[in-house]
């Protein structure tokens, strides 16, 4: 069996190397370079294993996958920082075909997705693909609360600030921030 983090590393490394098709994984799973990058001395995941992972994107699995970003961020520090700023940014991702959940967005004047990207400095903490026919603030509160909970487990005394543009200004989000001592900009 293969650990989730190793499968994700494998997928990312091969995409970065220009091998975005799943069938490339069957050829390169025995490649010593990729095995070394991932820290394995055995065959990496097959295309069918990766395909099952990509198709099994339940909310629970998505949260587990996203936690890799947060753990990497936390582990990049030798000691807890005094304060951090979580930047929430819904952005357009233009579509050029008939992809699933494709919608026209009047503001962007195009067919697009509206992914939500959360960063802290140069670290990506969450990347959540969403259709564009939704309120840009959809799921922001849920993602913010999960991130704060995860970060506070490791850094209970770190001051957290939520930063976003006015498109994410919702009473539910701001009231939650105030109740949980999270500053917001």
Region roles according to the model:
Residues 42, 47-116:
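Active-site-proximal, Lys/Arg-enriched surface segment
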Residues 10-11, 22-25, 46, 50, ...:
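Short, conserved catalytic/metal-binding motifs centered on acidic residues
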Residues 134-185:
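Domain-level cores of phosphate- or acyl-group-handling catalytic modules
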Residues 1-9, 138:
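Basic, short loop/linker segments at the boundary and entry of helix-turn-helix/winged-helix-like folds
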Residues 22-37:
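DNA-recognition alpha helix
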Residues 37-38, 95-101, 125-130, 171-176:
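Short acidic, glycine/serine/threonine-rich loops at helix termini
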Residues 8-16:
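Short, amphipathic alpha-helical "recognition" segments used to contact nucleic acids or chromatin
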């Amino acid at each position: 069996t293969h650990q989730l983090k190793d499968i994700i590393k494998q997928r990312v490394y091969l995409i970065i190397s220009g091998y975005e098709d799943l069938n490339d994984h069957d050829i390169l799973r025995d490649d010593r370079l990729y095995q070394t990058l991932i820290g394995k001395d055995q065959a990496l995941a097959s295309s069918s294993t990766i395909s099952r992972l990509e198709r099994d994107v339940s909310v629970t699995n998505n949260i587990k996958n996203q936690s890799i970003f947060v753990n990497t961020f936390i582990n990049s520090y030798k000691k807890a920082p005094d304060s951090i700023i979580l930047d929430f940014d819904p952005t357009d991702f233009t579509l050029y075909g008939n992809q699933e959940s494709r919608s026209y967005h009047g503001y962007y004047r195009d067919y697009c997705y509206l992914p939500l990207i959360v960063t802290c400095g140069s670290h990506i903490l969450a990347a959540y693909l969403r259709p564009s026919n939704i309120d840009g603030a959809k799921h922001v509160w849920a993602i913010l609360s999960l991130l704060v909970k995860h970060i506070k487990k490791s850094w209970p005394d770190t001051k957290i600030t939520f930063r976003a543009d006015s498109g994410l200004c919702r009473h539910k989000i701001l009231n939650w921030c105030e109740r949980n001592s999270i500053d917001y900009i």
